[in-house]
Amino acid sequence: IVSALDRWLADAVQPAAQRWFGVPVAEIRQISAYSCRGMNGQPGARISEHAFGNALDIASFVLADGRKITVRDGWRGSPEEQGFLHDVQGAACEQFTTVLAPGSNRFHYDHIHVDLMRRASGNSVCNPDAVPGDVVAARVAKERGYAWRRGDPGVTGSIGKVSAVPKEKLKPSFKKKLKKFFAPEEDDDDWVEDDGPRPRDD
């Protein structure tokens, strides 16, 4: 799996990060690699590729400038986040024999699972179907638009930036919401190693 990951990182993840965010990926955070268990952590299920050290669950990408793109939030996040994540998921489908991302089932809502399972049929699994990031980002931008309503402080579709609206014009309650929205996430390195749903902190 290591050589497939290296190819995917070099050929797809880094170019996609440069394209969508203008900086490379500095770190990939995984939530499960080797784990001797059944598929999706379910008792009685077929043995998981994780049990063979042949799978990886990717939860987030940390960019060189410190921004963190989580699969859980970014899959339905800004056009840039969605475009990036769909591009890397689609490219993963070319490198791995199994790719499961949000929308595939309830166990993969917060990560992209990749493995090199060998099937007698020779078939691969790419679920949900790969859609180019450009297509996804254009659809999201069209649905959401980048214009804002009167009185809105003008949060743009890009992550981590707020347009130049004087702070004195913001209502106190909205200042609080913005502060919470842009607060750094808590470190999630303490996730347990399974594919089951994790409670959200919010």
Question: How does the language model describe each region?
Answer:
Residues 3, 14-15, 47-56, 60-202:
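Catalytic cores and adjacent binding grooves of peptidoglycan-active enzymes
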Residues 1-28:
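Active-site acidic/histidine clusters and adjacent loop/turn architecture
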Residues 19-53:
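Active-site-adjacent substructure of cysteine-protease-like catalytic cores
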